[in-house]
Amino acid sequence: MTILIRADEAETLSASGVTLLADMTDTDGHLTSHRSIFQPGKEGAPPHLHREAAELFFVLKGSLRVLTGEDLIVLGVGDFLHVPPNTPHAFEAAGDEPAEVLFVLTQAKPRFGYYRLLEGAYRGETDWAEVAATSGLYDNHYVESSAWQQRSLENKEVRL
């Protein structure tokens, strides 16, 4: 089935900077996709992993600092990254400009409910503990990462 989502028809979650494009239920279970804008100085996503889903990143504007495993890398405009299942990862804008990124998750569970829940947390309407409690439902499992915690203290970034 062919799917077309016009820019002016996509649902945008303003507090979190997420634009919902297509979910698993829209693509016959093939993929879910969204676009996110990350503001400088604000963490985009804390360390987490997906047990079932692979996550693809494509940077449209700005640059994105990404944890993948225990490595920190910086992606620039036009860079593509594939993070396989069970790989801890996190991300945020790198530098002084917002980062705009297209995400595609394959083999994923439907995720739009997760992004709407996050939107509520960013607005202060949902407790963050409620977000964490949905890890099994949305295949979003939060993990600890010393590399991510120390990212501002060490210069371990590698330009791809």
Which role fits each region the language model picked out?
Residues L4, E70-P88:
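Short acidic-glycine-tyrosine-enriched beta hairpin
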Residues A10-P47, A53:
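A short glycine-rich, His/Asp/Glu-containing loop-to-beta-strand
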Residues R35-Q39, L49-T68, V104-T106:
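Short, conserved beta-strand element in jelly-roll/cupin
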Residues A45-P47, T68-I73:
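Short beta-strand segments
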Residues R116-L160:
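Acidic/histidine-enriched, glycine/proline-rich intrinsically disordered or flexible terminal extensions
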